[in-house]
């Protein structure tokens, strides 16, 4: 293996690691506080669609580019799988909060402050 594919692989691995590390604190915060009113639903849906598409893309690269596909696409596949799962966790909290707020005829922030915050 020449040095260029190794450099590309290392960049992919570090990019993937930082992508996952950057996402973990937000997921922990949402799980602990159950607060999602500051996170856009459009963002979460777009993120999950993007992660899904990147996973499909990287799998296709690994299948059809057998010479260099697996080393270069594997970090992308793993990172987007993990971030997609983490994003899905936040999306589930977000949708639950929106539904509960609508039951009380409130916006998400008011619902959180009135019903969730006092129970933490």
UniProtKB/Swiss-Prot annotation:
It is found in: Cell membrane. Its main location: membrane. Signal peptide: none annotated. Keywords: Cell membrane, Membrane, Transmembrane, Transmembrane helix. One of its GO terms (cellular component) is plasma membrane. The chain crosses the membrane at residues 4-24, 44-64, 73-93. This is Uncharacterized protein UU041. It comes from Ureaplasma parvum serovar 3 (strain ATCC 700970).
């Amino acid at each position: 293996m020449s040095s260029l594919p190794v450099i590309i692989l290392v960049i992919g691995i570090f990019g993937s690691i930082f992508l996952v590390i950057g996402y973990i604190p937000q997921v922990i915060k949402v799980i602990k506080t159950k607060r999602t009113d500051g996170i856009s639903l459009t963002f979460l849906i777009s993120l999950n669609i993007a992660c899904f598409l990147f996973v499909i893309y990287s799998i296709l690269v690994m299948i059809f580019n057998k010479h260099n596909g697996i080393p270069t696409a594997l970090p992308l596949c793993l990172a987007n799988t993990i971030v997609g799962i983490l994003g899905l966790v936040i999306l589930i909290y977000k949708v639950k909060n929106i539904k509960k707020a609508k039951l009380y005829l409130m916006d998400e922030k008011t619902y959180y402050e009135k019903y969730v915050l006092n129970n933490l």
